[in-house]
Amino acid sequence: MQQYFVKGSAVSPVTIEDKETSKHMFQVMRLKEDDEVTLVFDDGIKRLARVIDVEARQFELVEELVDNVELPIQVTIASGFPKGDKLEFITQKVTELGASQIWGFPGDWSVAKWDGKKLGKKVEKLEKIALGAAEQSKRNLVPSIKLFEKKADFLAQLDKFDSIVVAYEESAKEGEAAALLQAVAGLEKGAKLLFIFGPEGGLSPAEIESFEAKGAVLAGLGPRILRAETAPLYALSALSVLVELEK
């Protein structure tokens, strides 16, 4: 069954105001009266909805659906600006894997340099990608996107998290294997966890020092060196095993 995220309150009848969503529903998918879809409103609750008026783009809400697929903890993925379209790939995949927020920051060793204007366009593009991935993976929410123009603004946000894990390849080389487990252990439902990943060139010693000063722990992600766009996927997959599949 098709799923769509819609703005506003869950009150029948629901009129689809967003032009792109409406186009996909009634021109691409060719929905007709009495067809049913899943609508997700701002409250994150899924509801079964039935088309009652194609021309008016209206649905009636049939029932709430007990289907919460979100991770039990809120995970933010923060990546140093990578080259090309790697952040688009990261956004799509970590959305599918359950991230609540997706952040980007200018790393000391980032090759990509984006000013305010470019960042605005990038955010718009990433938001569309996150929306599509959230619909495809039947999420209850769409991850929020934030790209920081200044690293100082990013660092100022770190105090808001219950736990911070920095993916650091030097830790992997040293055979470290327990930091990720320790960082996740004991986190209660709804806790806020931040994963920080470097760009292609990795994280500088100065950045590591700044993150550790904020209480971050350094964690290796297995014995192999992962690409900038692969590491977030590994981390979220491992986290899912720890907080979902083992319970």
Residue spans for each PLM region:
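Mobile, glycine- and charge-enriched loop segments
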Residues: 37, 66-77, 184-192
